[in-house]
Amino acid sequence: MYFNTYNEKIIYVGKNDPYSLFSCMLAGVTYKNPNYRIVRNNCDVYVFEYVVSGKGSIEVGDRVYDVHEGMFYCLEKGVDEVHYASQDEPYEKMWINLDGELVRKIFSFFNLSTLYVAEVNVMNIFIEIHDK
């Protein structure tokens, strides 16, 4: 476990195996930081995040999605995206970055193209994953 320059606690670092059915590449917690901003072009993982508190935004293409406490979202691999914390009320979020054929098939089967956002409390699931 370590902290990076974005004030994120990295709790798991996996290995990239392009032939794997399912891989957890990275998992962690982003703590409140009004300057937090991530830009990903052709994102190389599937991103799953849960907003524990605060607010932020996600830009995909020409659309902006605002997220807040109690929201879950996932981003498809290969998209260009920007996500950032609110200046006034920066978020804390838990996240996991996944890859593999199984994740790709789930996105395809459930038509989860590009970005899926839902107001659903999945914090206990993220806590359980992070505790493993």
Give the predicted meaning of each segment.
Residues 23-26, 47-50, 99-102, 122-128:
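Amphipathic, well-ordered alpha-helical segments in soluble domains
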Residues 67-81:
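Conserved metal-binding segment of the jelly-roll/cupin
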Residues 1-66, 71, 87, 112-114:
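Generic protein-terminus/edge-of-domain signal
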Residues 105-132:
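Amphipathic alpha-helical segments enriched in hydrophobic/aromatic residues interleaved with Lys/Arg
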Residues 55-58, 73, 93, 126:
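Secondary-structure boundary/capping motif
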Residues 19, 95-98, 118-122:
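A generic short alpha-helical patch detector that favors 3-5-residue windows
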